[in-house]
UniProtKB/Swiss-Prot annotation:
A Pfam family recorded for this sequence: UPF0122
Name listed for the protein in its UniProt record: UPF0122 protein LAF_1235
Job description of the protein: Might take part in the signal recognition particle (SRP) pathway. This is inferred from the conservation of its genetic proximity to ftsY/ffh. May be a regulatory protein.
Organism: Limosilactobacillus fermentum (strain NBRC 3956 / LMG 18251) (Lactobacillus fermentum)
Gene3D superfamilies to which the protein is assigned, alphabetical: Winged helix-like DNA-binding domain superfamily/Winged helix DNA-binding domain
Length: 113
């Protein structure tokens, strides 16, 4: 469960990072991406551990709120699942059609940008 939560927060952070304040960005980056402890972040910013914890929890709620309104991550996941189904179908029914593979690769590369 904790790993799933971390993956979700990291994904939401990737989508909505520009909407966060500099402090929110810093705390989440250090906590989730760089695996700092609350104490290490508190020392880095000369604040209490509780202040870091409160900021991270508040920012997680903000990210979830953005996702509830904008659905960027959910739609991204749905498109990726559909692309996977298309790729599987093409590979099983048209294994030698390089043009179809190239078209799917192009579509997937658009998502990565």
């Amino acid at each position: 469960m904790e790993l799933e939560k971390n993956e979700r927060i990291n994904a939401l952070f990737a989508f909505y990072q520009p909407l966060l304040t500099a402090k929110q960005n810093d705390y989440l980056q250090l906590y989730y991406a760089d695996d700092y402890s609350l104490g290490e972040i508190a020392t880095e910013f000369s604040v209490s551990r509780q202040a870091v914890y409160d900021n991270i929890k508040r920012t997680e709620k903000i990210l979830e709120g953005y996702e509830q309104k904008l659905h960027l991550y959910a739609e991204f996941e749905a498109r990726n699942q559909q692309a996977d189904r298309i790729r599987d179908y093409v590979l099983s029914h048209y294994p030698t059609d390089q043009t179809l593979r190239d078209l799917i690769d192009g579509m997937e590369n658009l998502e990565a940008k």
